[in-house]
């Protein structure tokens, strides 16, 4: 499977810039998700790689082939880029059986009957849809139609499989099942997958790397846990995670050492020990980012607040804690319920607390209430 490289790729419509100077490399056999809010440029990026949209400028390389170069006037057609595309709408032929839907494209590619039969059986077995061979799309469930669409896309052995929000039409239970199937399929096929979604849960669970985009600009391009634990900026920290990260304004009180400072946090003193050298002053616009799991509720905790709301979800419970005029989120394992305004004691733990200077991440570190 090929390596894909985008070099200074930009797409404009008039004065509107959909994708701004994007540089990224998709390595062989990676599962990449293009993630971001609606209108951020993720689908435009996918379409430019596929050749369905022409960039305003830049260069795109698939394998050893330059498929687009604005300076050289190169723009290879989608049909010659050897990619498979799976859309939100599965676009199955309603008058064709499952077998015919899968083989129709291979017939147009002039494959031999023997090769068509062998490949169709291979992908149907891979997707576990052999029993539906003679059924029509209307006789299948949404998940079964999804599998047929994937089988049809994989049948010609494309170098890369592109997917544009393919699970968005499914219910929550089926989406969960199909995430499992897609991840296993990626392993079984040894293919390169590029997947567009606005659902951060899909991105976190499926991807080997996440490309998070906002307003056409790449904000971070890293493995899911790196994006979660080491967000580049406030946008990334806020977009990834459910419940979202807690953000609390802080002021510098004292510089203890190059990697250690005392901060004023909700009217309390907080010792922050960073993993790298800090470069902050009294004028710095500081914000602490704390994931809900780093605020455990414990008797005798260093901080005290009151229960604003309790949101039990069976396996885990989200507790909204009011402390002064700030509402914080804490997540605990199991089912628990607090009365409104009940006193809650909690701590700050862990070494994944992020200190932001303005809109830039300064360092990851641990914090201790003094």
Task: Name each model feature, range by range.
Residues 58-70:
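Conserved ABC transporter NBD signature motif
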Residues 35-37:
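The feature captures the beta-strand-to-loop junction immediately N-terminal to the Walker
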């Amino acid at each position: 499977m090929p390596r894909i490289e985008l070099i200074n790729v930009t797409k404009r419509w008039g004065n509107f810039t959909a994708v701004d100077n994007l540089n990224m490399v998709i390595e062989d056999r990676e599962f990449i998700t293009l993630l971001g809010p609606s209108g951020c440029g993720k689908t435009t990026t996918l379409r430019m790689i596929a050749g369905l949209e022409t960039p305003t400028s830049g260069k795109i390389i698939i394998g050893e082939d330059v498929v687009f170069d604005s300076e050289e006037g190169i723009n290879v057609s989608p049909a010659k880029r050897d990619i498979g595309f799976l859309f939100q709408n599965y676009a199955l032929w309603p008058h064709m059986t499952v077998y015919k839907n899968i083989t129709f494209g291979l017939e147009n590619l002039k494959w031999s009957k023997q090769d068509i039969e062998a490949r169709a059986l291979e992908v149907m077995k891979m997707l576990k849809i052999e029993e539906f061979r003679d059924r029509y799309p209307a006789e299948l469930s949404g998940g079964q139609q999804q599998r047929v669409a994937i089988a049809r896309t994989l049948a010609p052995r494309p170098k890369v499989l592109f997917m544009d929000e393919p699970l968005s039409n499914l219910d929550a239970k089926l989406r969960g099942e199909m995430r499992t199937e897609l991840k296993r399929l990626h392993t079984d096929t040894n293919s390169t997958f590029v997947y567009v979604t606005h659902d951060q849960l899909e991105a976190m669970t499926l991807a080997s790397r996440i490309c998070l985009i906002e307003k056409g600009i790449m904000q971070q391009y890293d493995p899911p846990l790196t994006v979660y634990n080491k967000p580049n900026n406030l946008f990334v920290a806020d977009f990834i995670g459910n419940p979202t990260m807690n953000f609390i304004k802080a002021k510098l009180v004292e510089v203890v050492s190059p990697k250690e400072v005392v901060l004023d946090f909700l009217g309390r003193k907080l010792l922050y020990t960073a993993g790298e050298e800090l470069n902050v002053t009294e004028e710095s616009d500081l914000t602490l980012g704390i994931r809900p799991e780093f605020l455990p509720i414990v008797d005798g905790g260093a901080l005290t607040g009151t229960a604003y709301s309790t949101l039990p979800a069976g396996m885990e419970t989200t507790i909204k804690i009011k402390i002064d005029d700030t509402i914080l989120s804490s997540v605990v394992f199991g089912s628990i319920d607090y009365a409104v305004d009940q006193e809650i004691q909690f701590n700050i733990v862990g070494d994944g607390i992020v200190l932001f200077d303005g809109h830039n991440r300064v360092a990851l570190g641990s914090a201790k209430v003094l």
